[in-house]
């Protein structure tokens, strides 16, 4: 049994409200769960922000016993400071070859094998370099 930490949808039509749940990966989205770990309201409140409440000690427990967060929950846990940022991959042009080098989410730069950051636009030759080579 693989335990996943995921969102379960509640609320009316066009007014979603989510609970953060620890549930078996085979159970349906809104089905049987093991524990409620928090809530997330994506609609802006009176202050204009989204509301989120999490039980950090229980989330840390479930992560320590091997529970896997879903992608939306991983982004929520990153925003709350509980997990490191999820890995991002730079995408090339539409229809062209994809660049699969990892990207640092804080700076938006490529990360080399030696953990050095390289500017994302440095992989393209500059106009001055191409003119010097042709001359």
From Swiss-Prot:
Signal peptide: none annotated. GO terms for biological process: translation. The keyword Chloroplast applies. InterPro entries: Ribosomal_bS16 (IPR000307), Ribosomal_bS16_dom_sf (IPR023803). Residues 1-7 form a transit peptide. One of its GO terms (cellular component) is plastid. Expressed at low levels in flowers, and, to a lower extent, in leaves, stems and roots. Residues 124-135 have a biased composition (Basic and acidic residues). It comes from the Eukaryota. Keywords: Chloroplast, Mitochondrion, Plastid, Ribonucleoprotein, Ribosomal protein, Transit peptide. It is found in: Mitochondrion; Plastid, Chloroplast. Residues 87-135 are annotated as: Disordered. Its main location: mitochondrion. It holds the Pfam family Ribosomal_S16. GO terms for molecular function: structural constituent of ribosome. PANTHER family: 30S RIBOSOMAL PROTEIN S16 (PTHR12919), SMALL RIBOSOMAL SUBUNIT PROTEIN BS16M_BS16C (PTHR12919:SF39). This is the only bS16 protein that is targeted to mitochondria. NCBIfam families: S16. Component of the mitochondrial ribosome small subunit. Belongs to the bacterial ribosomal protein bS16 family. This is Small ribosomal subunit protein bS16m/bS16c. It comes from Arabidopsis thaliana (Mouse-ear cress). The gene is RPS16-2.
């Amino acid at each position: 049994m693989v335990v996943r930490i995921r969102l379960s949808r509640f609320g009316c039509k066009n007014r979603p409200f989510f609970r953060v749940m620890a549930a078996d990966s085979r159970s349906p989205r809104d089905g049987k769960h093991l524990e409620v770990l928090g809530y997330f309201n994506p609609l802006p409140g009176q202050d204009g922000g989204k509301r989120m409440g999490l039980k950090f000690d229980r989330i840390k427990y479930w992560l320590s016993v091997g529970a896997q967060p879903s992608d939306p929950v991983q982004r929520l846990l990153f925003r709350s400071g509980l997990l490191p940022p999820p890995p991002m991959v730079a995408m090339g042009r539409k229809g062209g070859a994809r660049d699969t080098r990892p990207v640092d989410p804080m700076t938006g730069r490529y990360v080399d094998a030696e953990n050095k950051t390289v500017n994302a636009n440095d992989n393209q030759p500059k106009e001055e370099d191409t003119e010097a080579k042709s001359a």
